[in-house]
């Protein structure tokens, strides 16, 4: 079975940085998994997600997404980009546009070039966007402007836009970091349930262990650009968590559980 994402010996440094953001990272994610990247700020989680989304250049190693190897010097093909959806921490919505228009933006990679340029969605585009709005519980907000919404509503719009893209792999960067615990649980339930219903794989980042344990079948701990552990959620113990959030001292040996 082709992995949703496959990474081997990946290293990357941001231009001008004195230390690498990612160092010798290896990771495989099976189709249909819900996997959490767990770690403190600066661990490398956002960088890894951006790289899998095809937005970074100049890395070393092997990276394949949905069976297609990525080129460290070129953006991925348009068709492959359409298969990978991204939920941004800060939403990345068009504030003065309506909710429906923002969700339809998720269809741009599926539209013909002419429709994309003209902003003219097809009946299918409208149907898919409508289904995403319904699944995210915001069907009644379609004509509202985004700048009139609450933070929780905006995150639902961002997820609906991602779902409208019909991705096979969903990458979510700290999708609930700005929400209170109850809202955070609602949003992650929505995201993981919608992905499961569509047969999509989810890789999300978090710095909150309790959310990672609840919504991921597998947790990958990251610190200082390296993987500290990669374990099924039931096997993650308190010692591994303590090692992950220890600020000083050497990195512990990587604990791995093979993906089958």
Features from the language model and the residues they span:
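The feature captures the beta-strand-to-loop junction immediately N-terminal to the Walker
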Residues: 38-40
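Helix-to-loop junction immediately C-terminal to a conserved catalytic motif
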Residues: 53
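Conserved ABC ATPase signature
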Residues: 145-149, 153
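Conserved catalytic motifs of ABC-family nucleotide-binding domains
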Residues: 166
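ABC ATPase NBD coupling module
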Residues: 70-85, 115, 119-122
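Catalytic Walker B motif of ABC-type/P-loop ATPase nucleotide-binding domains
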Residues: 170-173
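H-loop/switch region of ABC-family ATPase nucleotide-binding domains
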Residues: 206-207
